[in-house]
Amino acid sequence: MLSLRNATEADLGEIRRIYEYAQDYMIRSGNPTQWGHFYPSADLIRSDLQKKVCKVIYDETGIHGVFALFDGAEPTYAHIEEGEWLNDEPYVTIHRLAGDGRVHGLFQCAAEHCKLLSPNVRVDTHANNTTMQRLIEKNGFKRCGIIHVMDGSPRIAYHWTAR
């Protein structure tokens, strides 16, 4: 059974290994531009750890997944094109979800945790990341439109609401 906890500095090696696996997987799967081999950077991972937003998903055999969970307004979500958010209520955001390829259910575990924290959860992904799109939609999120991340590149924006 999968569990979730706050990541610690002791997890840094496993977290980096998981992100490296995910980078390679995305490139092999036809999504070479979302992360490439450079995102997330070591500095960004350390920042997530320091801010206590980095979460790990694990079972009795070890850590299998990682993501960042943010509570509050996401600046890149302020403007959405080709649609609209389901509501303007406070929300949490899932960012940088990655897995090691050894277990299934990582997004479901992260989403269920977030749904307990907030009646509104948002997430975005690249148009070429069809694996993530399927997982997001399978977990009840609605496609709302297109947002642009800090570098200006577009992402498909999703929103789940309990209401």
Q: What is the predicted function of each stretch?
A:
Residues 99-116, 134-138:
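Conserved acetyl-CoA-binding loop-helix of GNAT-fold acetyltransferases
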Residues 23-43:
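Conserved GNAT-fold acetyl-CoA-binding loop/helix
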Residues 43-56, 73-75:
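A short helix-loop-beta-strand connector motif used in the catalytic cores of GNAT acetyltransferases and
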Residues 56, 62-72:
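Conserved beta-strand in the GNAT
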Residues 116-128:
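Conserved GNAT acetyl-CoA-binding A-motif
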Residues 3-17:
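A short beta-loop-alpha structural element at the N-terminal edge
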Residues 68-102:
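Conserved acyl-donor/pantetheine-binding loop and adjacent beta-alpha core of acyl/acetyltransferases
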Residues 124, 142-156:
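Conserved catalytic-core motifs of GNAT/GCN5-like acyltransferases
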